[in-house]
Amino acid sequence: MKKIITIALALIVSISMVFASSVFDDFKADLVANESKGFAESLEGYKPSNPQSMGMGGAGLAINDSLDSLFSNPSILGQGKVRFSIPSATVTVNHVYDLVKKGEDGKSALDKIQTAIKEGAADNISDLVPIVSSLIGTGKSKIASVEASVGMLANVFGLAMNVNDTVRSFDGTVFDDLKISAVMGLGFGIGNDDVRLNVGFTGKINVNAFSKRISVNDAMNFNEETINQLPFAIGYGIPFDAGVSLKFHSLKATATLTDINILGLGDYKYDMILVEDVTTKLNSIDAISGEATKIRENSVYQFTPKMKLNAGIAFDTESSTGIKLAFDVVDILSIPDALDAGYSTKGVLLGHTKSGAEFSLFNFLKVRGGLNSGYFTLGGSVNLGFITIDAAYFWEELGVVAGEKGLDGLSLRFNIGWDN
């Protein structure tokens, strides 16, 4: 009897391993086939989603000195300021326009969802699948995200941590994208309040975990068993960023070099794991450390992001009732590749430019507007002393050139912090 039990257990383990291996092979094949189309943002490290910048068309590299910008502009470490964020939380919902716009039948997706719920879709969630599938469309897109961050600046030293979870879609399927990023850096500044040069350098540990793509129907009928058998790719990279900024009275200019890969540390190496194995494999700090070592040594998939050069200029009156104007050019190094690929010069250049303005009406109220790759954005913030609330309705370009794949979103952030 003991032998029979042993053989049975061995068969069960073998079958489960074969099943998991098959699932992982399919997942890896999907990554290879759609690396640049559907998974590029998931494979790369965390990029800050700052409603202040979103409301200004994605611009503000030279003037945005919030703790969020520590993830994208290390030169803020040369300002010599002290700042705490404990914490900030951001919620973003996409496809807002698609949700409320009227179709050929005179009804919006929101109208159809409300009607379906009244007719019993709450009991049969599958009735909502066609509506949701039509809403997210084809190609790559995002549905919603939540994130939280904490951080501090202490003169020339800064550190921050961010957790972001985004539900993405690609060709009618959906998948979860979780990112955890910790950044630490040093900077220095030369000059005074009117004329100043700031330089900063940061290192980041970016941990990415994203699931295999599943159908909308499966996503809307999730249960514990389905979740436990869902495979995730999990990996991390350690990229470095450098930034320099120059201030001359009200004029400011900033340049950053991000995703610098030193000694291969910036390569993202991935292993694959089932959800049900997470609690058993990652149940302690030692276990996490051991798994992290295994991922780097025995990775099944590797992604190397390209280094990015960004530049921004701005005009900032630095007064409580003043105005800020900003213009950025992002990912400059990829522009020649896009032009060589045959894309139009106008579309490529417009797709890499961001511009915006911020008007401070009072000490506590700001209004923003801008153009993000040609799409109009707007936003604002209210400072209540103990908490700052930022909101933005924005459009962003998910394609290579302006006008290829626009996506809108509504973002709201609450920040409890102290600034000096």
Which role fits each region the language model picked out?
Residues K3, A59-L61, D65-S66, S245-L246, ...:
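Short hydrophobic/aromatic segments of transmembrane alpha-helices and their interfaces
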